């Protein structure tokens, strides 16, 4: 580990992540066995999770990406900015939004409403990480990898100021850390 990562505390191992993502892929494959869903990955954080999840599904599917920003450092800005929209037509299609983490719920609520506005057949949400009790959502999160404590996490695509996405396990930054 580099100096900036020495203060991190491991939350989830590579094996725990791999096993859970594979289980999520199997569950999605069963639920969508008669469909050709469109997986919409939320950039940048979900790209590693999305790739592993897609390798775990056994159904035909399509892929697109959307990019929003709501964080600056370790704090949510409270506003969502759309940086890249989807490019495919989702009208009448089953859509699965693939998110890295649901924390405040602002991003996923914005995305869910935006996707619903394009008149898909259905919209499901798959998230690797979920901080329960914090997000106030008026829809269900269909596929949850892990429920985690209210800590700031990095690794496996999740970042702190665009750094530490490359870590193959998920770590949390201890409270009071000067990272």
PLM regions and their residue ranges:
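PRPP-associated nucleotide enzymes
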Residues: 1-179
């Amino acid at each position: 580990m580099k100096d900036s990562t020495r203060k991190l505390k491991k939350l989830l191992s590579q094996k725990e992540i791999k096993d859970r993502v594979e289980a999520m892929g199997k569950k999605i494959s069963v639920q969508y066995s008669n469909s050709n869903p469109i997986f919409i990955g939320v950039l940048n954080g979900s790209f590693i999770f999305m790739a592993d999840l897609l390798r775990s599904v056994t159904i035909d599917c399509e892929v697109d990406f959307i990019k929003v920003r709501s964080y600056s450092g370790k704090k949510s800005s409270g506003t969502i900015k759309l940086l890249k929209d989807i490019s495919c037509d989702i009208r009448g299609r089953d859509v699965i939004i693939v998110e890295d983490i649901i924390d405040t719920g602002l991003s996923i609520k914005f995305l869910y409403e935006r996707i619903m506005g394009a008149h898909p057949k259905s919209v499901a949400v798959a998230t690797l990480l979920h901080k329960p009790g914090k997000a106030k959502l008026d829809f269900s999160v269909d596929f949850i990898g892990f429920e985690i404590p209210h800590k700031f996490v990095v690794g496996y695509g999740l970042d702190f100021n665009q750094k530490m996405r490359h870590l193959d396990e998920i770590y949390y930054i201890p409270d009071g850390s000067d990272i």
